[in-house]
From Swiss-Prot:
<dbReference type="GO" id="GO:0005886">
    <property type="term" value="C:plasma membrane"/>
</dbReference>
<feature type="transmembrane region" description="Helical">
    <location>
        <begin position="104"/>
        <end position="124"/>
    </location>
</feature>
<keyword id="KW-0645">Protease</keyword>
<comment type="function">
    <text>This protein specifically catalyzes the removal of signal peptides from prolipoproteins.</text>
</comment>
<feature type="transmembrane region" description="Helical">
    <location>
        <begin position="8"/>
        <end position="28"/>
    </location>
</feature>
<dbReference type="GO" id="GO:0006508">
    <property type="term" value="P:proteolysis"/>
</dbReference>
<keyword id="KW-0812">Transmembrane</keyword>
<feature type="active site">
    <location>
        <position position="125"/>
    </location>
</feature>
<feature type="active site">
    <location>
        <position position="143"/>
    </location>
</feature>
<keyword id="KW-0064">Aspartyl protease</keyword>
<keyword id="KW-1133">Transmembrane helix</keyword>
<keyword id="KW-0997">Cell inner membrane</keyword>
<feature type="transmembrane region" description="Helical">
    <location>
        <begin position="70"/>
        <end position="90"/>
    </location>
</feature>
<feature type="transmembrane region" description="Helical">
    <location>
        <begin position="134"/>
        <end position="154"/>
    </location>
</feature>
<keyword id="KW-1003">Cell membrane</keyword>
<dbReference type="InterPro" id="IPR001872">
    <property type="entry name" value="Peptidase_A8"/>
</dbReference>
<dbReference type="Pfam" id="PF01252">
    <property type="entry name" value="Peptidase_A8"/>
</dbReference>
Amino acid sequence: MATRFRSTLLVITLFVLIDWVTKLVVLLQYKDLQILTHPTLYTHSWGRFSFSIAPVFNEGAAFGLFSNYKYFLFLLRIFVILGLLAYLFFKKKSIQSTTQTALVLLCAGAIGNVGDIIFYGHIVDFISFNYKQWAFPTFNVADVLISLGTLLLVYKFYFPTKQTEKKR
């Protein structure tokens, strides 16, 4: 196995572990508060803006969408992970660093959420932001990784480097 791919797997593993550890810490804290209907583990407010940590169990995709298709979503996530890993392995020499970083973030986030489904039967979300009456959907570290990876790919598409333009 090539050194570059091995280091890529190491970075993916590190991100997945960070995601899983944060979820485990929240779930262990939540376990003590299960007598409450919807316990909030931590809340902090700055004027009209607030941040809270409270576990929410999500059986769908982003923001709980398509929760009726959880088995299809699970298989789709597995195929996406396998596709990303295959691309990272077979294109390891020609892939640009920005693209590689984006794919690593996407892969780590997907693995983190698939791990939740395997171990808990649902995705564990716990980070929540609110502004006045507006509440952003609850998310987790894996979702942040997926969002950052997606933003990097969009950035790369709209602002290609000279190397990318030559390949087109």
